[in-house]
């Protein structure tokens, strides 16, 4: 099972979402920023590293707000751990994605998210975690 961390990064009531490029697995799907936990790495450390690599920010990682296990039809499975991020240093910059944007949580279902993120997308759209 692949272990992944992702951030719910908030700014003025909006949440940061990212669109994969055409060349990534599951191309053009939307997701929350983050990535794989490397061998021997703690989840919060992995998320700090990923946010620095992908967005150029030094994030203050808050509480774990959700943990989701998902199995794709291909048989691949993933455990996603989502953490709240309300504070960070630096300006958010798009280093690897096709597009990034700040979305109103109620609008999240309009975007074509990764299947593993859909439960959380519905919760966020319903006002959870705001």
Which residue stretches match the model-derived regions?
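Generic C-terminal helix-cap and adjacent flexible tail
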Residues: 125-130
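Active-site-adjacent beta-strand/loop module that shapes the phosphate/pyrophosphate-binding cleft
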Residues: 58-59, 66-92, 99-102
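Conserved hydrophobic "DFG−1" position in protein kinase catalytic cores
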Residues: 9-10, 17, 87, 102
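Conserved N-terminal beta-strand and adjoining loop/helix that marks the start
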Residues: 1-16, 36
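Residue-level signal for inorganic ion chemistry
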Residues: 7, 32, 104
């Amino acid at each position: 099972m692949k272990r992944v961390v992702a951030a719910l990064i908030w700014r003025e009531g909006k949440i940061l979402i990212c669109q994969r490029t055409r060349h990534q697995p599951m191309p053009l799907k939307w997701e929350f920023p983050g990535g794989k936990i490397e061998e021997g790495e703690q989840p919060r450390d992995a998320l700090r590293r990923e946010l620095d690599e992908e967005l150029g920010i030094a994030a203050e990682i808050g509480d774990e707000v959700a943990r989701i296990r998902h199995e794709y039809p291909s048989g691949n499975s993933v455990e996603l751990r989502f953490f709240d991020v309300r504070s960070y240093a630096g300006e958010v910059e798009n280093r690897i994605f096709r597009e990034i944007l700040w979305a109103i949580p109620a609008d999240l279902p309009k975007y074509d998210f990764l299947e593993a993120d859909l439960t959380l997308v519905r919760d966020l759209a319903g006002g959870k975690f705001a």
